[in-house]
Amino acid sequence: MAGNSIGQHFRVTTFGESHGIALGCIVDGCPPGLEITEADLQTDLDRRRPGTSRYTTQRREPDEVKILSGVFEGQTTGTSIGLMIENTDQRSKDYSDIKDKFRPGHADYTYHQKYGVRDYRGGGRSSARETAMRVAAGAIAKKYLKDEFGVEIRAYLSQMGDVSIDKVDWNEIENNAFFCPDADKVEAFDQLIRDLKKEGDSIGAKIQVVATNVPVGLGEPVFDRLDADIAHALMSINAVKGVEIGDGFDVVNQKGSDHRDTLSPEGFGSNHAGGILGGISTGQEIVANIALKPTSSITVPGETITKEGEPTQLITKGRHDPCVGIRAVPIAEAMLAIVVMDHLLRHRGQNHGVKTETPKI
C-alpha cells in the first residue's frame, strides 16, 4: 500500500503535490473537546512557510489552512479532521527543462522507475511542500499534548555546514530566521548562506528536537518502541539522512560506566539515552537529532541522464532553499508531536489503570 499515513490511534494521512491545486490531510483519532482554531495551526505553518526570509526559497505561498471538518464551534468533535491548503504561487514553467531529465540527488529517477509516470513540476509528491500538512496536523497534536499533559515540543538548528552552536537559549530561537538558539552564531549562519547563494550551491544541517514533560511509560515494545517510531517519523522528512536518539552515534566512544543513566530517589543522574529505555519513555526529556542533506536543487551543473538513458548535463532552475534545514525545524517538531500523541493515546487505552509501588522519579 502507498505510505501516505502515519500513526495508529492518532493517524495522519496527507495528500497533494507541489504544483497541484491544493495540499490536504485527514487527522483521525483526536479526542473530542480540544479547543482549536485555524489560527492555532497557522502559527506553526507561518514558521515553515516559504518566502518569509532571504535565506529560504522565494516561492511565496500564504499557506493559509482551512479546517474542513471535525471541528464545531471551536472544539474538536472526535470525528475526522479535514485540513486543506491551496497552492497559489506555482511556477511550473521553471521545471520544463527537467520534464525528460532526472535531477541528480532527487527522487525523479526513483519515482519514474517505481510508478512509470512522474509529476516533474517541483518534484510533485516527493517535494517538501507536502510537509506543510504534517505541520498543520502536528500543531493539533502539540496543542493537545500541552493543554492536557503539559508536554512541550521544541526544536532548533544546531549546525549548518561547519558552523555549530555553542549554547542553547530557548528564548533566542524565534528572534532570528534560522531558529538558532545561539545569538552569537546568527551572523556566521547569515554569511554562510550569502556565500552559498553566490556559488549557486547548498549546504546540509543538523536539528535537535526535544519533548519535555513526557509521561513515563510511552512506547509499545518490541516493534513499536517509542524510539523506533520517532526514528521512523523523523526519517520520513524530506532530506533527512540520519537520526540520533540521545547521545546517538557518540555512544561508540563511551563506556558502560559512563553511558548508563544512574537512578536515585531524586531522579536520573544523566540522560544519555535521550529519555527512552527499552523503547519506553522514562519521564525525562526526549532528545533527538536529525541530519539533513544539502539540497540537490542548485545552479552548479551536474551530470545526469534523460528518460531514454542518454547522458546530459543539468542546471536546476526555480526557487529553492540553500539550506533545507532552516524550514525543517517546525517539521521536526510536528513529527515528534504526532508520534508522542499517538503513543500517549495508545498507552492510555491499554495501561490507564496500571499502578506500581515504585514512585516516579
UniProtKB/Swiss-Prot annotation:
Pathway: Metabolic intermediate biosynthesis; chorismate biosynthesis; chorismate from D-erythrose 4-phosphate and phosphoenolpyruvate: step 7/7. FMN binds at residues 125-127, 238-239, 278, 293-297, 319. The gene is aroC. It catalyses: 5-O-(1-carboxyvinyl)-3-phosphoshikimate = chorismate + phosphate. It is an enzyme of class 4 (lyase). Reduced FMN (FMNH(2)). InterPro entries: Chorismate_synth (IPR000453), Chorismate_synth_AroC_sf (IPR035904), Chorismate_synthase_CS (IPR020541). This reaction introduces a second double bond into the aromatic ring system. GO terms for molecular function: chorismate synthase activity; FMN binding. Its EC number is 4.2.3.5. It comes from Vibrio campbellii (strain ATCC BAA-1116). Keywords: Amino-acid biosynthesis, Aromatic amino acid biosynthesis, FAD, Flavoprotein, FMN, Lyase, NADP. Pfam families: Chorismate_synt (PF01264). This is Chorismate synthase. One of its GO terms (cellular component) is cytosol. GO terms for biological process: amino acid biosynthetic process; aromatic amino acid family biosynthetic process; chorismate biosynthetic process. NADP(+) binds at residues 48, 54. The keyword Amino-acid biosynthesis applies. Belongs to the chorismate synthase family. The lineage of its organism: Bacteria, Pseudomonadati, Pseudomonadota, Gammaproteobacteria, Vibrionales.
